[in-house]
Amino acid sequence: AKLSTEDLLEQFKGLTLIELSEFVKAFEETFEVGAAAPV
């Protein structure tokens, strides 16, 4: 299912900072990018 930007932001609002950092790490591993890389 494709989420809109608003849906994603609502999901992130419910996360803790630890959960967010874990998500970013998993995202980088999945897409082989760094957080500073343009998407």
Curated annotation (Swiss-Prot):
The lineage of its organism: Bacteria, Bacillati, Actinomycetota, Actinomycetes, Micrococcales. Homodimer. Part of the ribosomal stalk of the 50S ribosomal subunit. Forms a multimeric L10(L12)X complex, where L10 forms an elongated spine to which 2 to 4 L12 dimers bind in a sequential fashion. Binds GTP-bound translation factors. It comes from Arthrobacter glacialis. Disulfide bonds: none annotated. The gene is rplL. GO terms for cellular component: ribonucleoprotein complex; ribosome. This is Large ribosomal subunit protein bL12. One of its GO terms (molecular function) is structural constituent of ribosome. It comes from the Bacteria. GO terms for biological process: translation. The keyword Ribonucleoprotein applies. Forms part of the ribosomal stalk which helps the ribosome interact with GTP-bound translation factors. Is thus essential for accurate translation. Belongs to the bacterial ribosomal protein bL12 family. InterPro entries: Ribosomal_bL12_oligo (IPR008932), Ribosomal_bL12_oligo_N_sf (IPR036235). Keywords: Ribonucleoprotein, Ribosomal protein. The keyword rRNA-binding does not apply.
